[in-house]
């Protein structure tokens, strides 16, 4: 099993290219099931989750061709996927595939919309709280599906096709919004999604669906309207840059000091996180190449932050911010409002000497001047990268175990960081 070895203390200086967003690439790949024609996706990151979804789609008979090139140290366009679902041979998504990645459950929407029946295993993925699929099932039932759960599988049928409806989510749900959006594109009539998630990845998927011939308006607002069409066609779409990767590397620079250009990053995708970093003492400068992040000399200021749906502070950057605040000049408070049990990284950060107190869903971090390297264990995707950030600033050696979590969501992490001066390497046993 691979590990990552870090010797801390080096400032980061240089350029880091930002990859395509995993949280957009996955639903975009799934949307290819809505059409018999080929969907071409550019800037798809090379990640374990993307490879796993390719296996899942292949199980349904989807043909996927991949191409990609590197044209220089800082010019990396990810891969281009040509996805053809012309011959769907199986509408069952089995447990052994779906259990490894929660987002793969979303295939239920296009399979049901286009094939009118599907059987999908209940999902897996990061072990963060319960994250139930109840809201996703509710959305499909609103659109006229007959849904049953049997033997760990969700069985959904719509013999006459789906019908447009009002889908009002009782709380904001990114997964539910993706599922309702994809399913409604081929439903008869008009669907209105209220209390919809506003994340940029939702907008990216809606933009792609519209290129395919869908009629979606309002994506990026709490009210999305979809006029159903009888069929969708092929299209070509470029995956937007990953705002979570952007925020992660920005926090790494704020942690270590230095000056880094995050090439291809778009500030409007994570303005709340950039505002927090500015408050913490980083200098954020957007330009026509991306976002420049610097912290020279001055220490790290403590902050008070609550996670929130977009445009609020992302829950997927909560662990990284906590790592940064371990070195702040004073006490910080971080409240998690999106997921329960998302403080599994606290015990591991404590191994560096961090002082963190938990009270319900709020963590109080007492900043200390020096972290000390330690052997640590990753528990989930975002928690694992918070340990890397801590290790970059810690005195001595840090060994991060279970780095397969990192491979699910960060493309070439060691290469990008070492290219900016970090002492970081992957060790394969």
Curated annotation (Swiss-Prot):
Pfam families: EPSP_synthase. It comes from the Bacteria. Pathway: Cell wall biogenesis; peptidoglycan biosynthesis. It is an enzyme of class 2 (transferase). It catalyses: phosphoenolpyruvate + UDP-N-acetyl-alpha-D-glucosamine = UDP-N-acetyl-3-O-(1-carboxyvinyl)-alpha-D-glucosamine + phosphate. Its main location: cytoplasm. UDP-N-acetyl-alpha-D-glucosamine binds at residues 102, 131-135, 316, 338. Phosphoenolpyruvate binds at residues 22-23. It is found in: Cytoplasm. InterPro entries: Enolpyruvate_Tfrase_dom (IPR001986), Enolpyruvate_Tfrase_sf (IPR036968), MurA_subfamily (IPR050068), RNA3'P_cycl/enolpyr_Trfase_a/b (IPR013792), UDP_GlcNAc_COvinyl_MurA (IPR005750). The active site is at residue 126. Coiled coil: none annotated. GO terms for molecular function: UDP-N-acetylglucosamine 1-carboxyvinyltransferase activity. One of its GO terms (biological process) is UDP-N-acetylgalactosamine biosynthetic process. The modification 2-(S-cysteinyl)pyruvic acid O-phosphothioketal is found at residue 126. Its EC number is 2.5.1.7. PANTHER family: UDP-N-ACETYLGLUCOSAMINE 1-CARBOXYVINYLTRANSFERASE (PTHR43783:SF1). This is UDP-N-acetylglucosamine 1-carboxyvinyltransferase. It comes from Nitrobacter hamburgensis (strain DSM 10229 / NCIMB 13809 / X14).
């Amino acid at each position: 099993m691979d590990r990552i070895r870090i010797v801390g203390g080096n400032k980061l200086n240089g350029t880091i290219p930002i990859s395509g967003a995993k949280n957009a690439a996955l639903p975009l790949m799934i949307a290819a099931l809505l059409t018999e024609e080929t969907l071409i996706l550019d800037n798809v990151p090379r990640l374990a989750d993307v490879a796993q979804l390719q296996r899942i789609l292949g199980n349904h008979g989807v043909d996927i061709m991949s191409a990609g090139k590197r044209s220089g140290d800082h010019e990396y366009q990810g891969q281009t996927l040509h996805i053809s679902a012309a011959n769907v041979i199986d509408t069952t998504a089995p447990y052994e595939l779906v259990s490894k990645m929660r987002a793969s459950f979303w295939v239920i929407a296009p399979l049901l919309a286009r094939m009118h029946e599907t059987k999908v295993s209940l999902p897996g993925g990061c072990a963060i709280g319960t994250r139930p699929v109840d809201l996703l099932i509710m959305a499909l039932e609103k659109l006229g599906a007959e849904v049953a759960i049997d033997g760990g599988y969700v069985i959904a049928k719509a013999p006459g096709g789906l019908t447009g409806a009002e889908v009002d989510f009782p709380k904001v749900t990114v997964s539910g919004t993706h599922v309702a959006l994809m399913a409604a594109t081929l439903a008869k009539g008009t669907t209105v999604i209220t209390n919809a998630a506003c994340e940029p990845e939702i907008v990216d998927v809606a933009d792609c669906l519209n290129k395919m011939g869908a009629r979606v308006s309002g994506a990026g607002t709490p009210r999305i309207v979809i006029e159903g069409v009888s069929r969708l066609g092929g299209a070509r779409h470029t995956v937007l840059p990953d705002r979570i990767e952007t925020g992660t590397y920005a926090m790494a620079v704020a942690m270590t000091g230095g000056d880094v250009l995050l090439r291809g990053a778009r500030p409007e995708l994570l303005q709340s996180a950039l505002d927090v970093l500015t408050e913490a003492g980083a200098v954020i400068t957007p330009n026509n190449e991306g976002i420049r992040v610097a912290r020279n000399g001055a220490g790290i200021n403590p902050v008070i932050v609550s996670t929130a749906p977009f445009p609020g502070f992302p829950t997927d950057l909560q662990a990284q911010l906590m790592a940064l605040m371990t070195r702040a000049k004073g006490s910080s408070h971080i409240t998690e409002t999106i997921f329960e049990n998302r403080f599994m990284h606290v015990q591991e950060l404590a191994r560096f000497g961090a002082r963190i107190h938990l009270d319900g869903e709020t963590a109080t971090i007492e900043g200390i001047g020096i972290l000390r390297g330690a052997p640590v264990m990753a528990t989930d995707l975002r928690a694992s990268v918070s340990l890397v950030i801590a290790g970059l600033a810690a005195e001595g050696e840090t060994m991060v175990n279970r780095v397969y979590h990192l491979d699910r969501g960060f493309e070439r992490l060691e290469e990008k960081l070492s290219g900016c001066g970090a002492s970081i390497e992957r060790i394969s046993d």
